[in-house]
Structure formats: structure tokens, C-alpha cells
Amino acid sequence: MDAANLALGHESFQAEGAAFVRNRIYPSIYDANHVTHVTASTPIEIDRLLARVEQEYDGIDHRQFDVDFRTPPSFIARLALEGYERRDALLMLLEGDLADSKPECQIRPLESEEDWREYGALKHLDWREHEQRIKKAPEPEVGEALFAVARLKQPPVQYWFACLDGHPLAYFNSWAGLDGIGQVEDLFTHPDFRHRGLATALIHHCVAHCRGKGAGPVIIAADPADTPKNLYAAMGFRPIAVYSHYLKKLPTAKPAK
């Protein structure tokens, strides 16, 4: 489910026992350029897949594979051998009602160019905070690309603002999803306005929007090393699975063809 969400707005195709997601316009964004749903398991199959990956991502300075419990262990072992670094994601599911009551605040959809400019300003704060948390050197161009990639997803994803006195101070998105399972994602609140119920209000609104579009259960992906997972758990989301991103940064990249 989360793999389908990550592929929204990008080129995707099947080859050599895997699903490829690619966006040559935004080569620095890992989630826009990765491989998932790997079934290659024998040494020959794995060699063929890795060779195809080099062909399809020529000119891009990273390689990322998204894996879960269905991925052949032999393929994951090959990634470990070749020096890929693992980063986990926690998948959480809401089946019933949310536990907390919905705080009162204005929620409105992102629709206009001005809305997207406001989103871009908040996304810049989100990216800077992320860089500081993981002690990464500033890469403002990546933050700008993340903004553009998020916009590619709408529609079918719908972004929402939570506002105080008419000013957008938090955002989140909702997607009706596939096969009756919705997804909510990309939650951020301005650091100066946290603990005022904005995030909780957005979660309520986005879950309701998914269900209004036909979804029953709703999922969210969380960073197991960060604190938002605790908010989701307190509101009724339960952990159901862990999947992993295996990443390798290349020392140099050829010019994209």
C-alpha cells in the first residue's frame, strides 16, 4: 500500500522481477527513484536485476530498494554484502474510530498557487528540521524537490492545511487508496505552534476524508526513531509491519541521458 503511494506522480514499470519507480526530473529524491516488490531470488536473477537497475538509473547518484517480509532473504543478503544501508519504516493501521476527540480549528484543502507557496514555506521548515535531527549538511535543493514531488501526487492525494486565525500552520494529506484501504501521510506542524491540537485535528479530518471516499481501514507510515508514532498509537493506530529502505550513495554520477 505505501509502495503504491510512493509511486504516485512518477514513472513506474516492471522488469527483471521487480517494480521500478523513476523520475528523471527529480533524481535526488530517493522515494521518486527506487525499486520495490522484488521477487528475484537466485544468483542469476539477482545479477540480472542489479544490471537492469544500473541501466535504468544511469546518471542518478543513489540506488534504493524497498523491501518487506515478502522480499527474498537472498536478495536482502546481497544488498547487505554490497554495502547498502538500511532505514526502517513502521506501518500502522487504524480499523475503528480515532481515540481522541477532534480539536476545533480551521481545516482547508490546498487548491490555489498561493496555497502551494504556503505549503512550500512549511515544507522548507520541515526539511531543515529533518536535516538538523539527522545531523546532515544543508541541501536546500532537496527540500525544493520534495515540495515539487509532493505536488505531483495531487490528485489523487489531497493535501490539507490546519489554520489559526486564517494562517496555515500545519499540513497533512489523505488518499482513498486501493482496495478499500486508505492512507494518510506527510504530517508537519510549524515548530512554534505545536501542542495546540493542529496535528490531531488534521488526523481526524484526513481519516474522515479517506472514509468518505470509500476506505475502511486507514494506514500511516512512521519513522520508528521519531516521536510521531506515539501520537498515532495514542489515537488508535496499531503497528502491523516494518519495511525497510536499503540505500547506497554512489561516489559520482554520470550526466543523465
Question: What is the predicted role of each segment?
Answer:
Residues 1-60, 71-72:
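N-terminal charged segments
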Residues 46-53, 185-191, 195-212, 234:
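Conserved acetyl-CoA-binding loop-helix of GNAT-fold acetyltransferases
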Residues 72-86, 200, 224-242:
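Conserved active-site alpha-helix within GNAT-family acetyltransferase domains
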